[in-house]
Amino acid sequence: EGWIEGWGYDESLLAEGRTPLKGDLDQVSADRPVFIRRSDYHSAVVNSKALEMAGIDRNTPDPEGGAFGRDANGEPDGRLIELGAVRFLEAHAKPAKTFESAVESLLKLKDHYLSHGILTTTNMMVMRGSDPEPLTLYREACRRGLPVDFNLYAVWQGGEDSSGMPDFRADELRGPVRYAGIKLFADGSISGKTAAVRNPYKTAEGEKLDYPCGMMTLEEPVFLAALSYARRNGVQLSIHIMGDRSIDAVLDWLSDADPWLADVPSVRLEHASLLRPDQLERIDQMRLKPAFTTQIIFPFAEWRSYRASLSDADFNAAYPVKSIAQRLDA
């Protein structure tokens, strides 16, 4: 009984060369909900039962920061495009873990962390105020013997209101397990063809994209509200951002900003996969210079998807680590 769950599919590696749809997963089970995350952890696909439990039908509007895949008749086809859609289904249909089971799950990570010499780590996607509350959860796991320090980044849930989330208390920002910042998502992933890019994605024969140039999942008023909140609370603002089109937008929104943290960068751009030379030059002239975490693991782990998605020029220009290091103190 209960949910059938999985993770890790990449449609470019499947024999069918396409994303599974609800009809495919209905063959797994018609009476149990099925939920499969894509390899990028941004999108997912579910069966008809899961859609029914979440109340998602042709009249359900797309949520903020995501979209529901639909067939030619406007009916949901099972695709949950980007995190906004995934979170909608989780909030409306999936049961939350109990506090005890969540603590036990964290404690199981002890041997894994220690075997790799990891004593400090970061969770970039916690939902502050959820049940169980992340900070309480991680602190309890550490109290019971998990010997790891945790920096938690709370996903922004305040919308366009800079007071839309409660301010951090001083005790939440101190100690070996603490909140370290706020997380935003400006776009999707390159392998999933949802990162916001200037040049349209390549498509396979017969493939039709809902968003040929990806999708922005962040709007300026929301960004400015989160920026104001981070400044007021003295924490870092981290932005998931992959495509050059989304980088253009965020640089526009940051153009007049001043830094507010002294010891660490006030803003982090996570991934910055397609960062153009003119954008690097622009950043070099800004008062607030964001830091970069441009992980080159993606072209190795997902190179087939990147090859299938990007033009040769964009593929060869992705993750310009050397250019960033030479141009910026990043």
Residue ranges of each PLM-predicted region?
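Active-site-adjacent C-terminal substructures of enzyme catalytic domains
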Residues: 274-330
